[in-house]
Amino acid sequence: MNLSLREIQKLLVTVAADVARRRLARGLKLNYSEAVALITDHVVEGARDGKLVADLMQSAREVLRVDQVMEGVDTMVGIIQVEVTFPDGTKLVSVHSPIYK
């Protein structure tokens, strides 16, 4: 199986997001990398489902609450930018203050 660098990066985000979901289900708080992966995966999968950029920017801010991440993670994650392929082309989705307070 030959994967491009972009495909490898997508797979890594997906795996990290899956780990984050399992840790949340066990009641554990997420670290920076897990939180970013989970929100990024939400945006990528939402685009794949055909959602609009504006809808994804809003819904991504509701994926995690401050009580679900380790102390300080909410301030470390000021913005998440994801380049995503939509049916009408590739777009940059920016999610400001992605962890719900």
UniProtKB/Swiss-Prot annotation:
InterPro entries linked: Urease_gamma, Urease_gamma/gamma-beta_su, Urease_gamma_sf, Urease_subunit
Primary residence: cytoplasm
Enzyme Commission designation: 3.5.1.5
Q: What pathway does the UniProt record associate with this protein?
A: Nitrogen metabolism; urea degradation; CO(2) and NH(3) from urea (urease route): step 1/1
- One function term, GO molecular function aspect: nickel cation binding
Provide a GO biological process annotation. Answer: urea catabolic process
Q: Quaternary structure per UniProt?
A: Heterotrimer of UreA (gamma), UreB (beta) and UreC (alpha) subunits. Three heterotrimers associate to form the active enzyme.
Q: To which protein family does this belong?
A: Belongs to the urease gamma subunit family.
GO terms under cellular component:
cytoplasm
Would you tell me the protein name for this molecule?
Answer: Urease subunit gamma
Arranged from A to Z, the UniProt key words for this protein are:
Cytoplasm, Hydrolase
Catalysis performed (reactions): urea + 2 H2O + H(+) = hydrogencarbonate + 2 NH4(+)
Q: Where in the cell is it found?
A: Cytoplasm
Q: What class of enzyme is it?
A: hydrolase
